């Protein structure tokens, strides 16, 4: 049997995509709308406290197109903590008007294709560079791009039949492309084998949305992607600071 990849695992992630039920929202009187938005604001203030003490992260983006209107991206140190956030959000009155359209569960990971190279001989969980990757601070970038992906198991193009050494080299070559976008695109990789329908969830942040097109295009021509990758739907959006939520919901 081929050697299986080992991973270092950090925060658990939930991408929660919602569509606003505008027809139902319009039927509410302004007073009820304000009460619901205030309740949401208190919820987000509590989320900010968790962020400030280093026990998690979160951000909100407005999604373009008809796949969703919003994505709530939350990171926590356990599935229980993540589920608690999800359940509390669903109990908000405004959640009745935010219809689920898609979700993705993963855990921030760094594989031993790369982790040993980054950490050298030390305990990788004590390495500052590794920890920054596993427990990332979400950047307040203007745009987000999320997509799930898997590695192929198709005849001769079967990633899982390749020797470890070949997989390591392909991933390192693939990573060189990502590193060439340092300062332009920040990437968070969530492993989701056994958690969701694909094997990874990829989240990209940038102040220039065209950088998403450039990096994904360039990576498509790399062998690790061209031969061995399969992709799900892509979601793209704009940063939505919590203080601008009321403006979004104003009719």
UniProtKB/Swiss-Prot annotation:
Gene3D superfamilies: Apc35880, domain 1 (3.30.70.1030). Its cofactor is Fe-coproporphyrin III. It catalyses: Fe-coproporphyrin III + 2 H2O2 + 2 H(+) = heme b + 2 CO2 + 4 H2O; Fe-coproporphyrin III + H2O2 + H(+) = harderoheme III + CO2 + 2 H2O; harderoheme III + H2O2 + H(+) = heme b + CO2 + 2 H2O. The keyword Secreted does not apply. GO terms for molecular function: heme binding; metal ion binding; oxidoreductase activity, acting on the CH-CH group of donors, oxygen as acceptor; peroxidase activity. Fe-coproporphyrin III binds at residues 133, 147-151, 174, 187, 225. Keywords: Heme, Heme biosynthesis, Iron, Metal-binding, Oxidoreductase. One of its GO terms (biological process) is heme B biosynthetic process. Pfam families: Chlor_dismutase. It is an enzyme of class 1 (oxidoreductase). The active site is at residue 147. The keyword Oxidoreductase applies. Its EC number is 1.3.98.5. Fe-coproporphyrin III acts both as a substrate and a redox cofactor. Pathway: Porphyrin-containing compound metabolism; protoheme biosynthesis. Involved in coproporphyrin-dependent heme b biosynthesis. Catalyzes the decarboxylation of Fe-coproporphyrin III (coproheme) to heme b (protoheme IX), the last step of the pathway. The reaction occurs in a stepwise manner with a three-propionate intermediate. Belongs to the ChdC family. Type 1 subfamily. This is Coproheme decarboxylase. It comes from Listeria monocytogenes serotype 4b (strain CLIP80459). The gene is chdC.
